[in-house]
């Protein structure tokens, strides 16, 4: 149900990333089928579509074209949210892990999905301005979209999710 954000709590090694990847269409289930009737995001932090040899600018424009969006809009949105300044025009492979997290989350938020997939919570960053912007945008999106967060930390799920499920021994 759109707008009803779900948290999936599970210990390490229980299959959290696998279930998120299956929801995104990056992995196939061993049995059964997954049917998508909504626009489902790539998982937050998934850098599979990002080419490390290219700048954030080039990656934004490429991803925008893949999704049929205005490249100028996606680029300016990501520049504003992630605040990488001159680094935005440098190869992503030169970024620190925090910079990659900010870019990845900005890219995810630049595209309107019905369902946003987040593996292990929000990106850890000490940039207060980024945290404020990204948090506000995510809260706004929660009004019309669902966020599915998988984590081993209950407090992460409590902050963003209205309901939760437990993944244990392969059973949800």
In which residue ranges do the predicted regions lie?
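ABC ATPase nucleotide-binding domain signature region
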Residues: 2-65
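Short, well-ordered alpha-helix to beta-strand connector turns
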Residues: 113, 145, 161-162
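Helical segment within the ABC ATPase nucleotide-binding domain
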Residues: 131-143
């Amino acid at each position: 149900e759109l707008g009803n954000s779900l948290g999936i709590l599970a210990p390490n090694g229980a299959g959290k990333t696998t279930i998120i990847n299956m929801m995104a269409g990056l992995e196939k289930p061993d049995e059964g089928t997954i049917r998508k009737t909504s626009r489902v995001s790539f998982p937050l932090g998934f850098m599979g579509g990002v080419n490390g040899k290219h700048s954030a600018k080039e990656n934004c424009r490429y991803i925008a074209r893949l999704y049929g969006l205005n490249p100028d809009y996606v680029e300016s949105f990501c520049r504003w949210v992630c605040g990488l300044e001159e680094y935005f025009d440098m190869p992503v492979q030169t970024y620190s892990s925090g910079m990659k997290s900010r870019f990845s989350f900005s890219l995810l938020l630049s595209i309107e999905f019905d369902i946003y997939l987040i593996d292990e919570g929000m990106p850890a960053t000490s940039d207060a301005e980024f945290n404020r912007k990204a948090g506000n945008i995510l809260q706004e999106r929660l009004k019309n979209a669902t966020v599915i967060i998988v984590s081993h930390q209950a407090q992460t799920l409590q902050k963003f999710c209205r309901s939760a499920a437990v993944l244990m021994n392969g059973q949800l």
